[in-house]
């Protein structure tokens, strides 16, 4: 009996250690190499296949300096205003999310920063649980410890979902506006950013009033967005 208990404890601990060693190795690799495909992309494409949707993956990596500053400002203004200064976690946002989750009785709000969203996109899935949030936090801490902010943001910009099968700034710019990501205007960047929290909903409801309202909010906030240092030199 004691041996069984030991195995029941050791097995999940071993899996946790192995997974995080795998993740850490990939984080080191991604400091210099673009991901071939993220875990979230694979999960989403499998979901489309199971639903019988004929969706092709459109994922085009471009370097940081070939993405419009307008899009960078729009995303920071909307998703993580303190990105340039925090260590991966917005503690005020996390406390607010915990309160909302406690009131609802479910894990709905996440208080996720750009770094946390990237951790999910690279290595995790769409599930919502405190265990998954804990794993997301561990990955975020590892990534922030060994990766500079520009690279974290570059990885994020290239992995965001924007439509059915459309991932990354370049693919989204080409899909919606037939231009490279480097040429996005403020209005275009704000409208793309407004889609980020619910890209598939807005893919099905492109004339949503909520999308228009969110676009206007992003436009108003863009002027105060603080970018990582290399964009302010």
UniProtKB/Swiss-Prot annotation:
Phosphoprotein listed as a keyword: no
Gene3D superfamilies membership: Biosynthetic peptidoglycan transglycosylase-like (1.10.3810.10)
Family classification: Belongs to the glycosyltransferase 51 family.
Known EC number: 2.4.99.28
Entry's Gene Ontology cellular component terms: peptidoglycan-based cell wall; plasma membrane
SUPFAM superfamilies: Lysozyme-like
One of the GO BP terms on file: regulation of cell shape
Protein name in the entry: Biosynthetic peptidoglycan transglycosylase
Class in the EC hierarchy, top level: transferase
Compartments in which it is found: Cell inner membrane
NCBIfam families on file: mono_pep_trsgly
Transmembrane segment boundaries: 8-28
Pfam families, alphabetized: Transgly (PF00912)
InterPro entries listed in its UniProt record: Glyco_trans_51 (IPR001264), Lysozyme-like_dom_sf (IPR023346), PBP_transglycosylase (IPR036950), Pep_trsgly (IPR011812)
An annotated Gene Ontology molecular function: peptidoglycan glycosyltransferase activity
Function: Peptidoglycan polymerase that catalyzes glycan chain elongation from lipid-linked precursors.
Catalytic activity: [GlcNAc-(1->4)-Mur2Ac(oyl-L-Ala-gamma-D-Glu-L-Lys-D-Ala-D-Ala)](n)-di-trans,octa-cis-undecaprenyl diphosphate + beta-D-GlcNAc-(1->4)-Mur2Ac(oyl-L-Ala-gamma-D-Glu-L-Lys-D-Ala-D-Ala)-di-trans,octa-cis-undecaprenyl diphosphate = [GlcNAc-(1->4)-Mur2Ac(oyl-L-Ala-gamma-D-Glu-L-Lys-D-Ala-D-Ala)](n+1)-di-trans,octa-cis-undecaprenyl diphosphate + di-trans,octa-cis-undecaprenyl diphosphate + H(+)
Record organism: Neisseria meningitidis serogroup C / serotype 2a (strain ATCC 700532 / DSM 15464 / FAM18)
Keyword terms: Cell inner membrane, Cell membrane, Cell shape, Cell wall biogenesis/degradation, Glycosyltransferase, Membrane, Peptidoglycan synthesis, Transferase, Transmembrane, Transmembrane helix
